[in-house]
Amino acid sequence: MAMRLLKTHLLFLHLYLFFSPCFAYTDMEVLLNLKSSMIGPKGHGLHDWIHSSSPDAHCSFSGVSCDDDARVISLNVSFTPLFGTISPEIGMLTHLVNLTLAANNFTGELPLEMKSLTSLKVLNISNNGNLTGTFPGEILKAMVDLEVLDTYNNNFNGKLPPEMSELKKLKYLSFGGNFFSGEIPESYGDIQSLEYLGLNGAGLSGKSPAFLSRLKNLREMYIGYYNSYTGGVPPEFGGLTKLEILDMASCTLTGEIPTSLSNLKHLHTLFLHINNLTGHIPPELSGLVSLKSLDLSINQLTGEIPQSFINLGNITLINLFRNNLYGQIPEAIGELPKLEVFEVWENNFTLQLPANLGRNGNLIKLDVSDNHLTGLIPKDLCRGEKLEMLILSNNFFFGPIPEELGKCKSLTKIRIVKNLLNGTVPAGLFNLPLVTIIELTDNFFSGELPVTMSGDVLDQIYLSNNWFSGEIPPAIGNFPNLQTLFLDRNRFRGNIPREIFELKHLSRINTSANNITGGIPDSISRCSTLISVDLSRNRINGEIPKGINNVKNLGTLNISGNQLTGSIPTGIGNMTSLTTLDLSFNDLSGRVPLGGQFLVFNETSFAGNTYLCLPHRVSCPTRPGQTSDHNHTALFSPSRIVITVIAAITGLILISVAIRQMNKKKNQKSLAWKLTAFQKLDFKSEDVLECLKEENIIGKGGAGIVYRGSMPNNVDVAIKRLVGRGTGRSDHGFTAEIQTLGRIRHRHIVRLLGYVANKDTNLLLYEYMPNGSLGELLHGSKGGHLQWETRHRVAVEAAKGLCYLHHDCSPLILHRDVKSNNILLDSDFEAHVADFGLAKFLVDGAASECMSSIAGSYGYIAPEYAYTLKVDEKSDVYSFGVVLLELIAGKKPVGEFGEGVDIVRWVRNTEEEITQPSDAAIVVAIVDPRLTGYPLTSVIHVFKIAMMCVEEEAAARPTMREVVHMLTNPPKSVANLIAF
């Protein structure tokens, strides 16, 4: 008997020794088969996964870990990146404890064979973006030990899997950033082990999930961002006593903030921004003793900031901007010892800022702009020398800027526009090492600017409309990167320092409406970066520098209303970039030069110069004391009269001959073509005219024809042929294009290179965009090639171009014809806003202007524009919202939805037709079917912005600056999860 048992044991030992290597080899086979379906960017990925005769060689493969029996227990190939699909053979790695395939580019559905991975504790397939289909809940049933399930940022759809409630050990669950629909299953409230719940941006809807309050171990909960709940913040959440992060931003919450949240003693982050919350901020929130970040911005909250906030001793960030809050900002805010960011712009706060604000020494950013605040600026804002951004614009602050701010070396941006501030500006403000912009326009500052100034990064100074006096200090020349200098409407006197025009990057200078004397420095002739110069309404004397024509890129020169003498330099005629010239009301004399750029300017450019001789005058005025070429007697001598009569008869004969020849020459050029350049061009007008051939036409429209022209220097240009001035018709946008594109420069606005013109025809010359218009690509046969990454980038870049027009141009510029066909794409698919034929300057940014007729394109026109003809920048915002919907849906704004229905109405109709509407459900219903592998979170984010832009009420639409901010700043919790 004993011998039989011994033989049996030996047999089992032999079988074990025989088959153990075999099992290890099987895992190697599985890995090598998996490798064949995981393709790297340059062919096969996982280069060290190579077959070997060694039974445990696979255990040294990158991303692979084994147990003592050489069985694979961990497979982590995240951030490789890999393409391809997840092979069903993954289910053969039955000893896997950790499967992490995050941050790759896997596509397709999850294989059901994964249900064999019964030992799995970690399953992380996040940030692939292209995993699709319904999430197969059945694979989870046997994963009884699963602790982490992360599917964030993929394309899963359908309902959330109800099987989650069976995972009794699950601690981390993220289904965020997918295309799910419907409600959160109530059974999710039974996953008692759960510590992290991420359902943000998942397209969920239904009632606000109060049942999640049963998750007593929960520490982080992200359930906002493009989910759409009915109801408000569940009061029951006050029972989640271990909760550290509650993020319900942007999920259509209504009602008031529940006071029960004050029970969350461990909560350090509360994000409820971008909702429709009403009522007051509960004073009970001061019970959140661990709170560090509070964001309640962009809601409809009213009332005052609670005094009890003094108890929030750990808070670092308070964002309350864009609400309806009022009253005084309490002293308690200044008492908060760790406060770093305080943003309350666009509210109705009154009275003074807390005098103790910043005294804690930690303040980094303060933005209280667009309120009704008054009083003095607190002196301790930068006590800790950490303050970086100080924005106090559009209030009623008075008194001086505290001297202490002049010592704040951490400051990077100072914007204190439109207040009642007075006194002298601290000298130190102009010597701060990190400041990039100083904007003090529209106040009552007085005194002289400091004699000593310096700063390596300062690029913008705006001191317009104050009471500054004294001389302009030469020390301004110590700002090597200065680009913009606005000193207009002050009381400066003395000369313009030559050092200013020696700055290597100066592009715009305005010293108009001062008491400046002396001459224009000769150094202006060497300032090649200048684009705009306004020295008007001063007492500048002397002559115009002869070398002014060396400033090749100068587009605007206004030196009117001075005491300039001498003749106009003929070299100005060679300044092909110069589109605006104003020399009026000086003491210039001699003849206005003929030809060149002088053909562009009209008589108003030279008005008010008594002794200046305009080209059409036969005789020129002379100064008192000067003698004419002939005395009075000679003028009326008999011989003179005879000669005059003969000349008159001869002239009549010549005129009659000319009239008879007119019809013969009607089809010939009425004037020689003239090229006017806005930058240095290496071709001539003849080169442009050679390209006006039928085979070069690339587009036709109501304003004319567009040709592609190949210049001798191998540069392609786009030539837009307009109906000209001589036909009696309108100029079809010629003036608007010249006045706008001729004076602005921006990366995302198409460059106007110049124009060629004669009496009958205008030819506008643009940089050529080889990829055509967004409209052509989006709605043509190539639309499918515009994947989401490109579409999103185009949206951001076009928004930046429009933002520049609305917020960085003075006066602001309205485009008035924003549409996909007017967004052009260069060889890198970079977007450029184009076609300014309907553009309009709006002098007062807060006003609107009434137009005589509707401008714009059907399907893009804002509703208020159609029936009031009043236009402001929000009209452009509406049109841009339509473009965003085009990018999402891939459909034209009109013509595809039935009579009288445009894309905006179609989207709203679609929402009404969905049984359980949510942002995700709407996006799924309208998204361009040609898009593949698009990230749900990003598309919904853009969709939300689009719907804000196309609000019926203009006041409800965001500004383009806000649009750019939203497009370029994904929700905070989403951004953090992406970096997982």
From Swiss-Prot:
**Which gene is annotated as encoding this protein in its UniProt record?**
CLV1
What does the UniProt record say this protein does? Answer: Involved in the detection of CLV3 and CLV3-like (CLE) peptides, that act as extracellular signals regulating meristem maintenance. Acts with CLV3p as a ligand-receptor pair in a signal transduction pathway coordinating growth between adjacent meristematic regions and controlling the balance between meristem cell proliferation and differentiation.
- What's in the keyword line of the UniProt record? ATP-binding, Cell membrane, Developmental protein, Differentiation, Glycoprotein, Kinase, Leucine-rich repeat, Membrane, Nucleotide-binding, Phosphoprotein, Receptor, Repeat, Serine/threonine-protein kinase, Signal, Transferase, Transmembrane, Transmembrane helix
Tell me any Pfam family this protein matches: LRR_1
Q: Which GO terms describe its molecular function?
A: ATP binding; protein serine kinase activity; protein serine/threonine kinase activity; receptor serine/threonine kinase binding
Q: Which SMART domains match?
A: LRR_TYP, S_TKc
Cytoplasmic compartment segments: 660-980
Glycan attachment residues as annotated in the record: 76, 98, 105, 124, 130, 276, 314, 348, 422, 510, 515, 558, 574, 602, 631
- Source superkingdom: Eukaryota
Instruction: Tell me what this protein is called.
Output: Receptor protein kinase CLAVATA1
Repeats (LRR): which ranges? 93-119, 121-142, 143-167, 168-193, 215-239, 240-264, 265-288, 289-312, 314-336, 337-360, 361-384, 386-408, 409-432, 434-455, 456-479, 480-503, 505-527, 528-551, 552-575, 577-600
Modification type Phosphoserine: residues: S852
- Catalyzed reactions: L-seryl-[protein] + ATP = O-phospho-L-seryl-[protein] + ADP + H(+); L-threonyl-[protein] + ATP = O-phospho-L-threonyl-[protein] + ADP + H(+)
- Any GO BP: regulation of meristem structural organization
Q: Which residues form the Protein kinase domain?
A: 692-968
Assembly behavior = Self-interacts. Interacts with CRN; this interaction is direct. Interacts with CLV3 and CLE2 mature peptides (MCLV3 and CLE2p, respectively) via its extracellular leucine-rich repeat region.
Q: Which residues carry this modification: Phosphothreonine?
A: T868
